[in-house]
């Protein structure tokens, strides 16, 4: 969600509260000195992260020298490691980099250092931060791409009292919406990445996380029957023009974030659809640009705020549903995150990684908005509204967590995007598209 600047008194109260909690170093364990820390965050996110680190600095006496490296932090960090000048600690945005650094012996084994704190995370998150059975990282920030956003007023117009919990219910609700004169979906396409995110959710929910990871590694081919199932399942929704605002042809030019505006327009305009899919960052588009939407009252899966047309309009989301036959995959989540690793093992680095593994810093950023933590010890009360709370609870409760395939597929991600746009143009041409994708995966991944 959109980072929000809170009054100084509120931020001060948060910092004072955090200073007294358990994972901030006490005066008797002050380390002093300094620790260098790299991450990708800048601007508002950097300000929020700095606020989150403030209790650590005040309690430990250690100065954190933070440096923003932007979205190319992986490249910058690799060069620094190769040149023998890495930072003490870094937050990196994918598990692949952690695996590479651990294999090279460039980051510290945290298994014993975090022996009392690793239980703050579910097994799915600890597995993603491990290499050869040893823990090498701490997931400080998560992102949830398991979210379908809906306009409660449009659901109410079709007498739909609660969002769907299964894929079958989603298809049924689409029919119910159409019968009431409401178009079900605004399908974001842009240059292809939102369609890829959508398809990957369908694959995860139908095939499961193990198969998903095998497809990512290309140990499962793109011609596998599980891929076909995902395509045919997705076609149940996007293969019918009347399900989409603008139809299939119009959806091909549905750029982000304009696709969100079709469900959550500015005051004075009417919605063109009831639902839109994309990650948790959609909330920024719903509440920004002088819009006046308020978060729903119960977060994921529940009833929403009032649908009285004279009242303030609201928004909500539900978790991307699995088919009822694949209900075991319901809590599997596709997304992203930032994992902290130690490149120089010093007392200051160890103190900082312990702090990042605890709930205090994450709770501060959570209260500021635009943040979700997979840490089980971050209290639900830290989140400013029911929607952000629901997003975070889904991360914490994930049975498995996978990263977007197009973030892990080497140089052929843009080919993948185009392939999925080609599928949208002709949903019956699955076998040809699968064969093309498998050839591209072989060329892009080298196997």
Predicted features, each with a name:
Residues 4-8, 12, 19-99, 364, ...:
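Conserved N-terminal structural module of periplasmic/extracytoplasmic solute-binding proteins
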Residues 93-146, 171, 317:
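Hinge/lid segment of periplasmic solute-binding proteins
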Residues 111-123, 206-230, 301-310, 322-331, ...:
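Short, solvent-exposed loop/beta-turn-alpha elements that line the ligand-binding surface or hinge
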Residues 136-140, 146, 171-220, 229, ...:
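Extracytoplasmic/periplasmic solute-binding protein
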Residues 156, 393-447:
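Conserved C-terminal helix/tail region of periplasmic/extracytoplasmic solute-binding proteins
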Residues 318, 366-418:
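Long, aromatic- and glycine/proline-rich binding clefts that accommodate carbohydrate-like moieties
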Residues 281, 290-371:
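Extracytoplasmic/periplasmic substrate-recognition and gating elements
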Residues 209-292:
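Extracytoplasmic ligand-binding clamshell segments of periplasmic binding protein
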